[in-house]
């Protein structure tokens, strides 16, 4: 099983690489040909989209999506998969999942720490913006925690920082790419 982590010059690439490596995944730079492409989180939406475009990852991810090949977005990666985010004055996303991302209006911002995701257990969150999409599949404290549409699936939390439960979640992501 090989995994391509779509770096964009920022983000949590190394921790995601380590987490998938612990599960036995082999890392590759071939975004189109990998069993699973991962869009990691952390950073600014505008800088992330610019970095994806500079590296050609936006085109490679669109090709994967159109071919029905799995893409997994983590935190900002989930938000970048949407049509648009209001972050940085408004930024077009990859347009893989209908929806948008908006600044959190309630509670402490940024939202950082452990929070329950439906009945699955607690995962680690670190974000100031959240997805708004009709394709949500899990929630945490009124915020979309997971969304799936076509071959794209993503989570707002950080499974790579969520201990044993996060490792189980990443294993599920790998298993979806085996189908």
Residue ranges and their predicted role:
Residues 25-34:
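Short acidic low-complexity segments
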Residues 42-111:
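Cysteine-nucleophile active-site neighborhood
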Residues 3-23, 160:
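N-terminal beta1-alpha1 ligand-phosphate binding loop
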Residues 66, 99-179:
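Amide-donor transfer/coupling interface in amidating biosynthetic enzymes
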Residues 38-40, 154:
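Structural motif
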